[in-house]
Amino acid sequence: MPLVSAKEILDDANKKNYAVGAFNINDMEFLKAIFSAAESEKAPIIIAASEGAIKYAGAEMLYAMTKTMADKSKIPVALHLDHGSNLNSVLIAIKAGFTSVMIDASHYLFEENLKITKQVVNICKPLGISVEAELGRLKGIEDNVSVADRDAVLINPAEAKDFVESSGIDFLAPAIGTSHGAFKFKGEAKLDFERLKKVKELTHIPLVLHGASSVPERASKKFEEFGGDLKGAKGVPFDVLKEAIKYGINKVNTDTDLRIAFLAKVRESFATDKSQIDPRKIFGPAMEYVTDVIKERMKILGCSGKA
Ligand code: G3H
Ligand code: 13P
Ligand code: ZN
């Protein structure tokens, strides 16, 4: 079916209290792996492409591939710009056919973030394109950090209410203690659930967890078994993820887990099939492994069977 807006997918998740995976792509291999998982789990999906992905593959290419896959499928699929840093990136995504955008002006002060976000909403709303924005900064928070330092980094729930009402965004990414990449926590994985609960109570809109990868053991073990070094990487454990969903997270952004899984399998193939010269024999099994990791994740998110 035609691509839908992420709002359409997330409004249902919000109403029924489950989460949908937003999975990052840069190429055909990850895209096909995500679709395989979605078809097999009967789960809606949000395909996310960052500015880096657009630089790597081109917005038109990412759109054409995603649309081709979506048209053949009965699963609801949205194509979303991840961390658009300025209006120009948003316009590039819209022109290519993306159905959803994130404007990430969270590094600016509140008023400037709001001003830029409003501009994006004004452009996107009439086109039926959904808009995500972010408040607070994605930075791991350690236990011994002071209340003032915590407040400086994490979302302020009262500001969130004001921001959502004034901007008209469709969903919000609150900083509650996660960070991007494979190294999220030194000690115990802890998120600020009290803050999350307040943001949900005050805004009622779908909420997004960035930096949500779990660094699942089976993929990280394989990565290291075949010569990789993840240097003690640590993600958001499945039970913490489930709790976050219980308190209002409806979109779970995942890139790092897919990267680790893909390259773990590539490492295995390189180590066990040293004379292989056909890339398809290396990438094929890696795609299947990514699909397995995503299927496991969809069950945790609660989106399996929701398509
Ligand atoms: O949030 C960041 C995503 O993982 C995309 O990463 O900017 O390296 O494409 P990237
Ligand atoms: P991870 O690095 O935890 O996969 O987060 C991805 C993300 O937030 C994309 O926006
Ligand atoms: Zn992110």
Annotate each language-model stretch with its function.
Residues 225-230, 236-307:
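C-terminal alpha-helical cap/extension of soluble enzyme domains
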